[in-house]
Amino acid sequence: MLTKVLSKEVKPCLACPICTNPFKDATTISECLHTFCRSCIRNKFINERVNACPVCNVNLGVFPLEKLRSDCTWQDLKLKIYRAMMESLKKAGPKTVAASVKSSKKKRKSRTSLRVSSSRVSSSPDTPLEPANVVVEPPNVVVEEKHRETVLALQSTRKPIITFQKRGRKASLPKKIDSKPEPELPPKEPKIKNLFDLNNEPEDNGLDEAEGSTFQEVVPKEKDLCKPIFSLSVTLNINDTPPDIVEPEISSDDDTEESVEPIQNKCVVNRETKEVPVQVNQNSLLISSDRDREDNSGQKLKTNGAATSRSRKKKGKKPVEKSYSLRPRIGRRTVNPAAGTTTPEAPVSVEEEMKVEEGRNNNPVWFSLKPSKTQNIEMLLPPITACCIRVKDSNMTVSYLKKYLMVKLGLESEDQVEIWLRDEPVCSSLTLHNLVDWWVQTTPLPERQSAMVGSSAAEFIMDLYYSFKSDASDSGSASE
């Protein structure tokens, strides 16, 4: 059934409240069910930072865009209504369209006739004026076409001239550059000969001005480069072994005098800095600055910025590349600068061990309680509901576990229950952290596994078993 409805009544229902136009991608707010264009409501939320419905002002929370839902019903209504309107226009369309086409053609013809008449009057001013109603279109069109052909012909004749002039200018530029004479470079052989002559002659030897200014500019620079090579005249070769230095040995007795061997070379040479050599005395000791590294003899060494070596004749040590500085003795004993700052290690280690033990004792303990199937088979106890138990205080004794089982199983006293670990009874006064240590120590090596992050912890829970206390265990506990 088709019904006719006024468009004025329908359009407000299909219009967006923000832009007052028909819906484009109709979207509905899920909280209040008001419909808008998708672009309009998104701009409202994003650009204007509005967190409420523009119509009813309902708060949409922190993320209002998540409350938007595309509404297909409004889109279908819009398509149905506007299709009917378009079909009604198409039915009445051919007549109106033909009339509009004819009117447009008439307008175009009138405009072209006016343009032709105006151009004709301006081109021939001496000709008498013609009445406005008379219009001759074909000859004017031919004249315009001829005029265009002549203009194109003139343009085609002018183009090669312009290009020829441009090419001529481009070709003339490199000729000016080529006309300049290039400076001749001096040959390289005389420079090499001159360098050999400089090496053989003294430094104050002057050059004649007739040889050219280029040699006077180049030679001093190369001579300066050669200076450090010739100035490094050192009596000792770098690859040679350094002089042997014997350090005075300290005797075990403090009262006896030190036995010092004769020193072959009593000077320490610093090759790079060329410092003044220092004589080694009996009251001085060679030490290196690498305090963390100790020599094989146990004494520490101190570097002085260069690389030298030391070797002892008695022990036959290999030379070590070090430089040495002198440090005075105080009362014939070497003073350790770091001795005053060190603290006794024993008290610190004991405190750390106590802290570690306290932290271990404060850790919670996980275990499981299961009924024993090997002990006291005649009177088996039922299982409890809890599969795993966690105790925060690891200093708790086993007697609390017996009380827990007494409550869960409904027994008269805790003495009726016996707790087992690996087929061995557990004493009631034993603490839980000691029980965990016992469980770890008694675990055989093949059964021990390394824990992985994210894996199941069921295999790392201590299993405890409970049963009725038998007479044998009572007699055993009484004898103890």
From Swiss-Prot:
Membrane-traversing stretches: none
Pathway stated in the Swiss-Prot or TrEMBL entry: Protein modification; protein ubiquitination
Annotated GO MF terms: ubiquitin-protein transferase activity; zinc ion binding
Annotated stretches, region: Disordered: 93-133, 167-193, 241-261, 280-356
Organism of derivation: Arabidopsis thaliana (Mouse-ear cress)
Keywords: Metal-binding, Transferase, Ubl conjugation pathway, Zinc, Zinc-finger
EC supergroup of this enzyme: transferase
Protein name (record): Probable E3 ubiquitin protein ligase DRIPH
Signal peptide annotation: none
Entry's Gene Ontology BP terms: protein ubiquitination
UniProt feature, compositional bias: Basic residues: 103-112
Biased segments, Acidic residues type: 246-260
EC number, UniProt record: 2.3.2.27
Amino acid composition bias (Polar residues), ranges on this chain: 298-309
Catalytically driven reaction(s): S-ubiquitinyl-[E2 ubiquitin-conjugating enzyme]-L-cysteine + [acceptor protein]-L-lysine = [E2 ubiquitin-conjugating enzyme]-L-cysteine + N(6)-ubiquitinyl-[acceptor protein]-L-lysine
Phylogenetic placement of the source organism: Eukaryota, Viridiplantae, Streptophyta, Embryophyta, Tracheophyta
Residue ranges with Low complexity bias: 113-133
Pfam families tied to this protein: zf-C3HC4
ZnF segments: RING-type: 16-57
Biased composition annotated in UniProt, kind: Basic and acidic residues: 175-193
